[in-house]
Amino acid sequence: VTTNEKQGTRFDDNVFSQELVVTHPALWSPETPVLYQAVSKVYEGNTLKDEYVTSFGIRTIEVIPNKGFFLNGKRTPFKGVCNHHDLGPLGGAVNDAAIRHQIRILKDMGCNAIRTSHNMPAPELIRACDEMGIMVMAESFDEWKAMKVRNGYRHVFDEWAVKDLTNLIRHYRNNPSVVMWCIGNEVPEQWDGNKGPKMSYFLQEIC
């Protein structure tokens, strides 16, 4: 579709950015889950030293008060489910074929969205949603600091919440199926008029 090249020297900080223009892109949606590939190559002279392929889609999202969620400029109601990671009786181990089978069943019943309750999603799930056309609300964690269960995330929240949420966003920011980030599930702090809004704002700023 397009190409670009940028040269660097051994004295550079090894961090650089490029901008590409895609004219008349095919937009990603549940009905037309079109994907592109960005192929990054690093050369030393004429020798290829490294190559990395990033799959991505092109789409716009917007939430308009009193009107709803808009995908590619079109109002798009969510017809979704809370999707736990355990794949029913198969257990918690990631099974790509079972994930895709599950998504086909969901699409057949009219679903267009998944909330990854109540954990960060596996890459295999997001890749399947990209390819098969399912919008995703990617959930971060099930607990903040207040106790819900004895061995919950609250024990590591202060140490890991920012790192985990940041990593979640960076890992899936190129995936067109991910249209929302979820900062917590049924957290008790939401009923605290002081702590709840402060923590919510703190986590939203990371997103």
Residue ranges of each PLM-predicted region?
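Secreted/periplasmic carbohydrate-active enzymes, especially glycoside hydrolases
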Residues: 1-128, 132-136, 170, 179-180, ...
